[in-house]
Amino acid sequence: NHESELRSDGYLFMKIINRAIEIKNNVNNEIKLGSLDIQRDWSYAGDVMKAAKLIIESDNGEDYVIGSGKPTSIKSLVEFVFRYFDLDYLNYFQEDKNLLRPNEPKIKYSSPKKIKEDFGWETKLTVNDILEKCIEQKLLEFNT
């Protein structure tokens, strides 16, 4: 999965951030998500585009997997965002079984070994870096 501060509100990162801001401002008092145990590989869209550019410009016809190669749980995302706003997510989180996808694999992440070996490429921003960029953007939007 790729993320950036330009994502629309329907995506997970922005949903978590929006709820935390709303809770901090007493506009909302809960965040409903599916399982917090789901783990995914999230990379910054800018890093992904740099990788795509390298692949296209190489003209070698090879297939490459682009990603961080690191699974991160939804729980980790929620904890980071809520901690950023000095909130304890446990006071606001509600698991909603209706948000669970059937047959969803619990852990899903990439193996970017080949692109690193061939081009020296790897993601520059961590998941927390991406979350901070997204939070900063949302705070700008809320304050304008």
Task: List the predicted regions and their residue ranges.
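Active-site loop immediately N-terminal to the catalytic Tyr-X3-Lys motif
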Residues: D9
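C-terminal substrate-binding subdomain of Rossmann-fold SDR/epimerase-dehydratase oxidoreductases
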Residues: L12-T144
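Conserved catalytic-site region of short-chain dehydrogenase/reductase
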Residues: N1-L6
